[in-house]
Amino acid sequence: MSKTVSQQILRLEREQARAINQGDIPGATKMFDRAFVGFSSTTHERIRGLAALAKTFQHYLDLSPRLTYRIQKPQVQVCGSTAIATFYWSVELASGKTIHGRGTHVFARRGKEWRVIHEHFSRAH
């Protein structure tokens, strides 16, 4: 079962990356739970809820209308109804500048679906 769950989580991560790269904010927030809480690599304040998350994504797109978000070397750990995805990420901006970092998504099973209840992104040092 863990392999199947891992595949589901990785599919959600790929779908989110595709949505971000297409500027599709509803698609980018689709895998997140309504009660989502997280930390961004660009602001110190905690992000709470889907509206705040959508606002954060819109801020990124306002700064660089064309960007390419990628995740590399993802790993998924499954523990019952919780799964944790850790990965390295990069964002290439329209200017050609690339930003690198690390990310964690904590997923919880909600019925038959997996939803992100927490994320933590940080830039590489």
Where do the language-model regions lie?
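A beta-strand edge to alpha-helix "cap/lid" segment located at domain peripheries
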Residues: 1-30, 37-125
